[in-house]
């Protein structure tokens, strides 16, 4: 894959039937606030939430696929009505199973991830997307580098571009 900020072709974008998101570093800015009792808090961008609503309205299937098992991920997925699979050290088998279950070819899917544990999923899909502030280890696997950072409008940017090219 090519390391580029270039938006994929309209033909490629029109083939996207599903979007799979990592959570930390995509829905969030990859930081966590930890209380003295160990409870974790993150900040998500409301514009990104609107982006997922727009994708849902366009009948794009969505999944949050997270290495961490965390109530924050479940809560955000529930609020946005997005299926969540979490607590998986190896994401690729889960991605493959989910795509098969939803009758979506890997080439008809986009994966948005930001770190080394997303690398195999990024390599597996038709459109590999990373936020601008993704870890350097995933840049070479990206077909599309967003201009926005994770947790700061990256999902909304993706949704707006995808849907404006349909």
Summary of predicted features, one role per range:
Residues 1-23:
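Non-catalytic pre-domain segments flanking phosphatase-related domains
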Residues 15-17, 60, 107-108:
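Short coil/turn segments at beta-strand junctions that form active-site/ligand-binding loops
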Residues 26, 51-76, 85-86:
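Substrate-recognition element of Asp-dependent hydrolases with the DxDx(T/V) motif
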Residues 41-45, 84-85, 92-166:
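Mg2+-dependent phosphoryl-transfer enzymes with acidic/Ser/Thr/Gly-rich catalytic loops
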């Amino acid at each position: 894959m090519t390391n580029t900020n270039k938006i994929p072709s309209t033909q490629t974008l029109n083939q996207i039937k599903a979007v799979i998101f990592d959570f930390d570093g995509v829905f969030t800015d990859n930081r966590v606030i930890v209380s003295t009792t160990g409870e974790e808090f993150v900040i998500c961008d409301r514009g990104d939430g609107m982006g997922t609503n727009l994708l849902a309205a366009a009948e794009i299937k969505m999944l949050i696929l997270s290495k961490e098992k965390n109530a924050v991920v479940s809560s955000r997925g529930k609020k946005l009505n997005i299926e969540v699979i979490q607590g998986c050290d190896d994401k690729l088998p889960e991605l493959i199973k989910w795509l098969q279950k939803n009758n979506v070819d890997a080439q008809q899917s986009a994966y948005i991830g930001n770190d080394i544990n997303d690398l195999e999923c990024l390599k597996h899909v038709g459109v590999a997307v990373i936020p601008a502030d993704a870890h350097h280890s995933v840049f070479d696997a990206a077909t599309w580098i967003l201009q926005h950072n994770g947790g700061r409008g990256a999902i909304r940017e993706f949704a707006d571009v995808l849907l404006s090219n349909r």
